[in-house]
Amino acid sequence: MPLVTLKELMKDAEAKRYAVGAYNVINLEMIRGIIAGAEEARSPVILSFAEVHIPLVPLEVIAPIILAAARQAQVPVAVHLDHGQDHEILIRAMQLGFSSVMFDGAHLPLEENIRQTNEISKIAKALGVSVEAELGKILRPEGGGAEEEIEEYDPDDVYTNPQEAQTFIEHTDVDALAVAYGTAHGVYLTEPVLDFERLKLIKELTGLPLVMHGGSGLDEAAYITSIQCGIRKLNYYSNMAHEVANTLQAKLAANSAKQHKSYYHDISRWAMEAVQQDIVRTMRIFGSAGQA
């Protein structure tokens, strides 16, 4: 099936009020497991690769693998660069064939975020590539363990300001906007408190498909309410990666207890199966199952 853009996926998700899962990948097992899950669920899907994961696998190495898998899939697939901040890397991803990129300028002042977003958007639009931007600070759990982030904060200082979001979309040409309303990257240590009223107002003022980052580990009700309030792309990685690791540990321990040998090809198969199972579960919650 031909590669699709984020804009195309968001158009259908907006019309039918569901969210498309964007799943970060770092190897072939994750790529194949996600595609298998999407095909089982008959769901559109976004294969996402984060700039921060380039030290694990070079962009030029993994891009052809992701793109080949996407084109061979029996469901619509967009290939997306996640949390791109380096303009050179963003441009390389587009040149390699990614159908969507995220420019993450959330750490910048509003005016500079707008300026740099427009720089990337101009190049992307010329190449037929969709663009996601970010406004507001999406935290890590308990400040994420990052030294520069503190545990106590005023939501108005870090969450997306609805009026700024309106200004941002009036001065940019993006296809989706990632917003901060209480989610955090990583696995949650305590139950997050999500500001759904803020999310609804952002949707009302911008009209854009909105993106949830830090989508791992929320309860089902939080996902559903977020989608009802305007979330159309839902990033999901940490919980999936954690589930795979737990599965591998359990399988290896079981084989060891039976004095059975384990081989790397066993681990590869177990990983793909664990990813597929988790992906199907999330797609049913996100409402994308059956939409392809």
Would you name each region that the model predicts?
Residues M1-G21:
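N-terminal amphipathic alpha-helix/helix-capping segment at the start of soluble metabolic enzymes
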Residues L6-D12, L28-H53, L59-P76, G84-L205, ...:
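Alpha/beta enzyme core
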Residues V20-N24, V79-H80, M102, L210-H213, ...:
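Short catalytic-loop micro-motif centered on adjacent basic/acidic residues
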